[in-house]
Regions:
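Small/aliphatic-rich secondary-structure junction motif
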Residues: 2-55
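Absolute protein N-terminus
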Residues: 1-2, 146
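General small-molecule cofactor/ligand-binding pocket signal
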Residues: 32, 88-92, 143
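Short conserved AdoMet
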Residues: 25-27, 81, 139
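Amphipathic, non-transmembrane alpha-helical secondary structure
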Residues: 15-22, 74, 98-101, 105
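A short acidic, glycine-rich active-site loop
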Residues: 53-70
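Gly/Ser-rich helix-loop-strand patches that form or flank binding pockets
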Residues: 102-146
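Structural beta-alpha unit
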Residues: 78-112
């Protein structure tokens, strides 16, 4: 049984990471889906810096970025739960790369799967700064998906 950690931020690259993880996973494997809400978002109910899957009007109604992230991950669980033994969801706040690395240790992940780039401030693509940091500092293998 492998324990796989998949970092998900709603970007196309992270959606491809989920798809690739499923291709690599066996029926007896365990997948943890992780979304990291940058600290600035977790502490603010109104900001211009939005995750791509989070619509501001829904935040005002639901009250929190973390709740919306959990809802999004729960939808993904429904799509993949029949393919593996267990699917966990985690939503953390803080620095995305740091939280991915901490969660990998906490969950005893055998591999980290993430997209090669994600979303940054105001929807602009980062040039893989989170991915780069995870690859350089991870104590387990990292699968970077394009």
């Amino acid at each position: 049984m492998k324990k796989m950690l998949v970092a998900y931020d709603g970007s196309d690259a992270s959606k491809k990471a989920v798809d690739m993880d499923l291709k690599c996973a066996n029926k007896e494997d365990e997948i943890t889906l992780l979304t990291v809400v940058p600290a600035e978002l977790a502490e603010s109910s109104f900001t211009k810096m939005l995750l791509p899957t989070i619509d501001l009007s829904s935040i005002v109604k639901s009250g929190s970025f973390k709740e919306k992230a959990k809802e999004t991950l729960s939808q993904i669980v429904k799509e993949i739960e029949d393919h593996v033994a267990k699917v966990n969801i985690m939503v953390e706040d803080g620095d995305p790369a740091d939280e991915i690395l901490i969660t990998a240790k906490k969950t005893e992940a055998d591999i980290i799967v993430l997209g090669y780039k994600g979303y940054g401030k105001e929807g602009r693509f980062l040039l893989g700064s989170v991915t780069d940091k995870v690859v350089r500092h991870a104590s387990v293998s990292v699968l970077v998906v394009r």
